[in-house]
Amino acid sequence: APTPATLNGLTIFAPNDEAFKATGVPDLSKLSNAPMVSLLQYHAAAR
C-alpha cells in the first residue's frame, strides 16, 4: 500500500513501480514537464 508523506501542507502518495508501469510510460524520466505534472497531480493532495 502507498505510504503518504507530508511536506509543507502537501501529502504525496507514492505508488509502487508496478503502478507507474501501468501508466504505459516505459521511462518516467523521459516525460516532458506537462505530462509529468499531469501524472503527479493524481498523487498529491493539499492538507
Curated annotation (Swiss-Prot):
InterPro entries for the chain: FAS1_dom_sf, FAS1_domain
Location of the FAS1 domain: 1-47
Domain of life: Eukaryota
Pfam families: Fasciclin
Gene3D superfamilies: FAS1 domain
Family, similarity comment: Belongs to the fasciclin-like AGP family.
Job description of the protein: May be a cell surface adhesion protein.
Stated name of the protein: Fasciclin-like arabinogalactan protein
